[in-house]
A protein has these predicted regions:
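Sec/Tat signal peptide C-region and signal peptidase I cleavage site
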Residues: 14-20
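Predominantly extracellular/luminal regions of secreted and cell-surface proteins
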Residues: 20-37
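Short Pro/Gly-enriched beta-strand edge/turn motifs at strand-loop
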Residues: 38-40, 62
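Acidic, Ser/Thr/Pro-rich low-complexity intrinsically disordered segments
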Residues: 21-23, 46-129, 138-141
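Sec-dependent N-terminal signal peptides
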Residues: 4-14
Length: 141
């Protein structure tokens, strides 16, 4: 029982440290991309490895201009992302639109939920690097 408690405490501290590292990475490397947009209160970040995928549902309000940013640590390579509506219809694909741009600006006509799907490319390296991937949303009225 004592060993289990120590192990759980160690995992908890590791998770807190990883989250703090992602927050620091986001502040230093991602927030400036919002330029002119007001960041929403959500902080959406994860530590991913090559081959990982993550999905996130976000609500966007009618009549507002938005900037969605997918910012990732360079060690992960060219992270791609898609934006889909609630029915699964693809609205944006970073691989087809502008692969070197980490953000997309848009306006929604009706309040709706959109699904953000992020994919880290596979790596042929024997060493698995992990890195932070952050999805930021900013808005203008």
């Amino acid at each position: 029982m004592k060993h289990t408690l120590i192990l759980l405490l160690a995992f908890g501290l590791f998770a807190m440290t990883a989250n703090a590292q992602c927050r620091s990475f986001t502040k230093k490397n991602c927030l400036s991309s919002l330029d002119g947009y007001i960041q929403n209160d959500n902080y959406n970040s994860a530590i991913l490895i090559p081959g990982d995928e993550a999905e996130l549902m976000l609500t966007f309000l009618a009549g507002q201009d938005y900037r969605l940013i997918v910012c990732s640590h360079p060690v992960l390579g060219e992270v791609s992302y898609e934006i889909n509506d609630a029915s699964g219809k693809r609205l944006f694909d970073s691989r087809k639109n502008e692969p070197d741009v980490n953000h997309v600006d848009f306006k929604v006509e009706t309040t709706q939920q959109l699904q953000i799907h992020v994919q880290v490319p596979d790596s042929k390296s024997a060493i698995m690097h992990e890195g932070c991937v952050t999805v930021l949303v900013g808005s203008k009225s």
